[in-house]
């Protein structure tokens, strides 16, 4: 029917072109078009009835998808011929419209053409509206009508792909399939697709704990940064003001402990006697030591006798030879201090009394060298751990959480424990290299020991010709031997670890004790050599913040005066310059040098230079004048007293600096301190008023 109607319309249109004055033909065309529109309305009503029936069967989600899919297919099949026919009809009508537009007709004919065109446009609009209505009905059945909520930000919907062949829905990614959710959690449950919220509500107590932990973490981070860069602490006067009491207490504790060590060292040197010895022979093949049968040898000296110089020289030379023999026997013999002991009994130097050797080692010497190396590692690890613990205690002081027991423990570790462990570590390192290089695998037994002793004796004799090294070594030997002779007296042969006295297995533990003492003696020489070298090095490579800050401030002032001369008359700038804080006034690492003349360098008042200067004066006096012979004291022992003065000088120096700059730090801290909110607002208001007043005065000066 539709096709026949369109054919008739085409014929009628052609007739209209030939007979424009025939109104009856136009009326017939309009009636036929209205019949076509009525037929399309009937088809659309049938489609709407089918869709309403599909909406009633919407219980299951999967069934609904299939129904919608089939309905789309049915509508597509039914509407396609009509759409094709409508397209053809539109094209023909457009052609007719163009022909009407191109033709030159009368006014009456134009009116008829406009009537025809308006009717065609209305019909086209009706067709488009019907198509849009069908599409809207389909979309309304498949899309939610509610607006999108803000929580969709946290929603992770599944990507569902429709299988056009079977008409089923497959879940590609995101979430679970609808059947699993319905079985476990009920219909329309998509709770697993919501990510858990990060905004968790916590209690007030947990909030306080979190803020406390965060504060402690930031303080520890600050303490580590200050420990790596000590000058950072001088940039905060609040920080320095709060920590002044802690620093003063710590320095007093260190000063008291240093004073106690100094007094005990003086008592050992002046009140504990040395063991008597004479006729020290350097030959390793024969008896190397002869004991003194007479006591009070030095009491029989006549100091007015000119020949006393030879006897004093013999005294010094005997102790020099004794120290060389003792060190050689310690480094080359079988009785070496070793926590991982390689033998249980004495011997003649061949196998150390231990006959059972593991298969991995060909000789006892290999096992011995390995255990000495293990002892080096052991003491190195212990030293490192103790140093870390002492550093941690120093950080506690930096973050103002150090109490008196912690400060006392830190002082004991840094003044006693760490130096003693360093001595043991360096002595074992030297022992390992000597045992490995000079003795090796001990193929020839006793001959290798004599070879090692001979080489070491010659080397140490050459080193002892340098008087500072000789006196430093004799000082450590004299202090240790005084302690042993007073608390646990032994023979000279035992103290020198002479090989002929070691056959008795009953004296094994006694020899181990003496070996431990020689370990301290050798380590003390190495440790104090490094200590003196570090003080000498620090004089020329010490950081001087005062000089750098003064130079930078002078450069800044010169540049400001040259570039902005007009600001000199500004009272506001003058007031700001007068209130500027000099960073050198807060530096707790150097003295205030304002009292010094300009031609004197600041390095002369640093603590390291003062300590080295005292050591130099003491060594020069001891070298020139010596020690009175009636004291029976080595010059090296007196020099150790001045070495023990170094921690005390440091503590006194730091206390002087703090006392010198304490008032300035507290003054600035009180002027610009942490205040409550009303006080801060009042202070800001006062400053704003003062700035406005200064600006007015400055403007008046410019106008004048």
Curated annotation (Swiss-Prot):
It comes from the Eukaryota. Residues 85-99 have a biased composition (Basic and acidic residues). It is found in: Membrane. It comes from Dictyostelium discoideum (Social amoeba). Residues 43-67, 100-113 have a biased composition (Acidic residues). The chain crosses the membrane at residues 255-275, 370-390, 414-434, 513-533, 609-629, 638-658. Residues 566-576 have a biased composition (Polar residues). Keywords: Glycoprotein, Membrane, Transmembrane, Transmembrane helix. It is a multi-pass membrane protein. Residues 114-142, 550-565 have a biased composition (Low complexity). Glycans are attached at residues 166, 354, 556, 560, 564. This is Transmembrane protein DDB_G0274347. PANTHER family: B BOX-TYPE DOMAIN-CONTAINING PROTEIN-RELATED, NF-KAPPA-B-REPRESSING FACTOR-RELATED. Residues 37-145, 550-576 are annotated as: Disordered. GO terms for cellular component: membrane.
